Amino acid sequence: MSQAGPGGGQASIASITDRVTPVSLGAPVSSVHFLRDNAVFVGAEESVAFVDKAGEIGRVATHGGGILCAVSDGKRVVSGGDDGKVVAVDAEGEVAVLATDAKRRWIDCVALHGDGAFAWSAGKTAFVRSGKGEEKSLEVPSTVGGLAFAPKGLRLAIAHYNGATLWFPNMTGTPESLTWAGSQLGVTFSPDNRFLVTAMHEPALHGWRLADSRHMRMSGYPGRVRSMAWSAGGKFLATSGADSVIAWPFASKDGPMGKEPAMLAPLPVRATVVACHPKQDILAAGYEDGTILMVRMEDGGELLVRRNGNPPVAALAWNADGSRLAFADEQGDAGLLAL
């Protein structure tokens, strides 16, 4: 990987654009996930597109309207829609309706747990259904902004206005409240289960050290953080929202408190989405001008995956072993990179 400074042109960055298989989806994309050898592109309306290694497209209808959220555990893609349904599609393209909101409210957020449990939200209510089919619900003070399961145990983080709630659905005790003024829109646990981080409506992140609820404020962004990804070992949290990838250090017991973040892959435009390699300290970053870079976190070395002059990048995902990268922009122009 070669390096280019903030003013460096794309011509100075080593290119692997010739390894990309282009895919034209013809419709906006909100996220992409891998199920076995297929990249599954989640559209904004009604269906997902299965794309194989050769770039052949097969569409699967999942919702009767807009798709508002989607997550994957590598076995299935679970999505929520404005039809009030939580829907799963597996690697074979088989579709199952997992839940339907009794009031047909929009399903705003979804989350998956390793043991087969899943969570979803509608309005102020978060729901969890265990792998055994037992369903629980919890109402929080305001509309749910994000959901995330802890890496250990059946514990759900629920982001909302003025903080987050930590809930053990299988326990009768009062859920734990973590407070911070403002609207929290996304939430993630660190892989070692020591920290919780939320993305705020304002251009900032907020975090808590779970052992003592100590606050961690991560600010200075010119725009909202819409994408967060943990590095393979959990040492860094990579984020969008600035004209470089901001990577906060989380290796020490204090996390990023008192430390400066790394600023990787600077460009004249903002990063829109980030995805960390599952095995190595490498990330992919997409930008407002359509550029996609692959970046080595150790020294900032860069490879050009896609040139600028395109709509903003909307989705990035690695497959399980990190040998393939899928991407798409807001207009549905996509690609598959084989390494």
Regions found by a protein language model. Name each.
Residues 1-339:
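WD40-repeat beta-propeller superdomains and closely related acidic/aromatic-rich repeat-like regions
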